Every structure is written in C-alpha cells, then in structure tokens.
Amino acid sequence: HGNVEFITNIKYLEEVLNGDKSKTILDIGAGTGAYSVYFDKQGYKVTAVELVPHNIDVFKAKNSNVDIHQGNALDLSFLPDESFDVTLVFGPIYHLMNKEDKFKALLEAKRVTKPNGIILTSYYMNEYAVISYAFMKKHILESKGDLTEDFHVINKPDDLYSMVRLEDINEYNELAGLERIKIIASDGPSDYLRVYINALSEEEYAEFIAYHLSTCERPELLGASSHVLDITKKK
C-alpha cells in the first residue's frame, strides 16, 4: 500500500499551497525528489537542495523542471533571503545530531522564506524509536546505555537518526522564532501496524487512510507517531 506519511504530507502541503501556482517551493534535503517532482508536475516552481550526489543523480533522471542544487541545509548562502513562499525541511532535521545544527538548519530555512511564508518541518519521534527498536525488536537490555533515565534516546555524533519529543520541537521553534500553525502525526499508528495494513484490501486501506487523516491532528496521537509534521510561520 502507499506511503501513509507521503499521502498525509501531500494533503497538508496542498492545503498550504491552496492551488496558487504563483507560490514558489523550496525542498531542503529533497532526497531523490519525491515531493519536488510531485509539485513540479502540478505546475509549481520548485527549487530543491540535496547533499548526497547519488540522490541527485536519481533525482535528475526523473527529468523534471525542478531547479536542483547540491548543498547543505546548514548553509544555504547560495539562495537569497526571503525568496520562497513554502519551504520544506523534511529530511535534514532528523539527520542532524545536535541541537545547534538543528537550530542552524531552521534559521537557514527561515531566512530564505518570505515574511508571510510557511515552513514545514518533519521530525523523527523518540517514543516510536524506543517502542519499535528497544521493545518490539528486543534490544532494550543492550540499549540501556543509549537511553536517559526517562527513556529519551541519547543522540551520538555517528548516529543516522536523531529522535525528539514534542517539548524538543517546541524548544527549537522558540529558539528559531517560529510560530506553529498546526502539528500533525504524519504516520499515526501506521508504522506499528505495517504487517496488518499490508494485509488490508484496497477498500479497507482506503478506510484506514480516511481514519488516519481524520485523527492525525489529535494531540494524543502526536508523540507516538514515527514522524510528525510541524507547520510553522515566522514570528
């Protein structure tokens, strides 16, 4: 079945864009271009920044009109201030291990976004990582040194992913001067239920998506989702 996170993020991005094709999009940490190419095909002007050369090669092979740059989310100095209506920060934040770098990436995203623009940031959540890795996969005993007393994952410099809790995200927004419009559980329970979801018929899966989209803003589901999408504007 389709990717629940992608379906959800597209729905909220389309709400933000509201069909206005004059709005410009910046996709920071664009990967192989899933979101960039989708909105390019819808007729939006999209600029993408990606760090990894292999990803850029795959992206370019998709033959889109996206303006693709190799670059780092921590330094977008090749892009002018206040030049994009909608800025996506879907990959970088959970690949940056320390708070200073996350803060720097958010500040760069904010700098290149227009005064009335919207910044959408994806985060990888702590509870999903602990439940799925430490307990479902039975790594808890050897993982104890990687967790604080209250079970927050300790991010180490050579880790691939950095996990956060909602209060961490609130702190980053406060530091970066971003004001939340809304926050969404992009995957909801889907990553826990993958085996069951994959066994659903197309009709049943459509009902699951309807359920998820009707509940993904509920506060009680946010922290347990594998990812959240934070939709913010400049203060």
Spans of features found by a protein language model:
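A C-terminal cap/extension of S-adenosyl-L-methionine-dependent methyltransferases
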Residues: 182-235
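A short SAM/SAH-binding and catalytic strip from SAM-dependent methyltransferases
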Residues: 86-100
